[in-house]
Structures are given as C-alpha cells and as structure tokens.
A protein has these predicted regions:
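An amphipathic alpha-helix adjacent to DNA-recognition modules
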Residues: 8-13, 47-70, 74, 130-131
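Helix-turn-helix
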Residues: 10, 18-52, 56-60
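Short, amphipathic alpha-helical "lid/cap" segments that border enzyme active or binding sites
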Residues: 12, 66, 87-94, 161, ...
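Hydrophobic alpha-helical connector segments
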Residues: 70-109, 161
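Amphipathic alpha-helical segments used for helix-helix packing
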Residues: 88-92, 103-131, 176-177
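Short alpha-helical scaffolding segments that buttress acidic/His motifs in well-ordered protein cores
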Residues: 93, 97, 112-119, 164-168, ...
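C-terminal peripheral helix-coil segments that are non-catalytic and often amphipathic
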Residues: 99, 103, 132-222
Length: 222
C-alpha cells in the first residue's frame, strides 16, 4: 500500500486509539495527526474535518453490522417463513452486536466503550451517521415486525426498536474487562444472545400502551 493511500487508515487508527483511551472531547486534532504521522490538511483532504474523521472511526467498527444483520434476517425468513417470529428477528439483529462486543473486549475494550459513548455525542456528523444506520435497518426490519406484531403501530414499533438499541449501546458503554462477565452475566455469546433477546422480546411483544391523549382525565371534585 502506498504512503498516500495508507494515510486515511493511519488517521482512523490513531483517532480510534486516542478517542477511546483519552476521550473524544479531550483529544485534539493535532494529537491525532501527530500519532498518525500526518497533518491537519490530510484530515480535511481525506475526510473533510474532525467530525467526519470521527464518523469514519465509527464506520470502521459499526459499518459492517447492518450487512450482517440483513444476511441473518434473510436466513430467518428462509427458515421460518413469514411472519418471522419476533425472537428470530431479534436474534438476527442482535447477534452481530454481541459478536463485535466480544471481539473488542478481548483486545480493544476501550474501543467498545467509546462506541457506546459515541451514540450520545453532540455533532451533526455523528447524529447523521447513527440515523442513517438506523434508517437502513428499519427499512428492512419494520415491515417484518408489522407482520409479526400486527396490533402494534409503526411509530410504536420504531420506538421499541430504539429502546432495544439503547440497551445495546449500554452494553458497549459499560463493557467490562475480559475477566469480568458484564451486565449479561456470561462471556458466552450464544448465552448472552438468549438473555438479551428474552429481555428485548418482552418489550417488543408487550401490549400496545394506551394513547395518553385518549385516556379520559378524572374530573376534580369541587
């Protein structure tokens, strides 16, 4: 690989390490370029700026997940037919996250925690990246969930899926060291998936909440 073509990879690697070890707010662009043996002009040339570099760091780890989810969703459709059981859909959606988390915990636990924190960072670039990832998955997943949960409206299904992903974000943000089991109580990915899916399926399949606007208010006694 040429020096020119290697520059973006070195910048992303340096940013990933420094963001995860020292915090994204405390890490200057100058520190990143120094660690990457590069300069600010290269950041602007290859990425457009610091926020876009941060987005590239996220995409290195999170970018492949949706493709993996889609493959697993398609396998679930082939195996079960339609409607696909909610548990099978959740297994397809959540397995890639747990496998990535397990991989990062072995030698990059700080990166796992950073990926969790990053979802709460201000800035248009990160917000747009997270939104685009969620929207891409929702286009494939929501129609299948509608078949499986016909009594839940689309807006509620989307809210419930956001809560599922908020749970995943928490797992990344609180990722324990390799010698500790973490929130799911086990290091075995298959067992983690069983426990996480059981929790999330209960929320996804819960009866639709009453619309507060339609609940009659009690009249005050005078």
């Amino acid at each position: 690989m040429s020096e020119i073509n290697d520059t973006p990879a070195r910048l992303v690697s340096a940013a990933e390490r420094l963001f995860s070890e020292g915090g994204e707010e405390a890490t200057s662009l100058r520190a990143i370029t120094r660690a990457a043996r590069s300069n600010a002009a290269a950041v602007h040339y290859h990425f457009g700026g610091r926020d876009e570099l941060l987005r590239a760091v996220l995409d290195r780890q999170l970018g492949p997940l949706n493709g993996q989810r889609v493959q697993l969703i398609d396998l679930a459709r082939q195996r079960h037919g339609e409607p696909v059981p909610v548990v099978a859909l959740l297994e397809a959606v959540l397995r890639p996250d747990l496998e990535l988390l397990a991989k990062l915990r072995r030698n990059k636990v700080h990166v796992a925690r950073f990926l969790g924190r990053a979802h709460t960072l201000p800035g248009a670039a990160v917000a747009e990246y997270v939104r685009s990832q969620n929207d891409d998955l929702a286009r494939r997943l929501v129609p299948l969930l509608r078949q499986s949960l016909p009594d839940i409206d689309v807006a509620d299904l989307r809210r419930r899926m956001l809560l599922v992903f908020a749970t995943v974000v928490m797992l990344f943000a609180t990722a324990p060291d390799p010698d500790q089991p973490g929130l799911l109580g086990t290091d075995d990915v298959d067992e983690q998936l069983v426990r996480l899916v059981a929790f999330c399926a209960a929320g996804m399949c819960a009866p639709a909440a009453s619309d507060p606007a339609r609940v009659p208010r009690k009249r005050k006694k005078h």
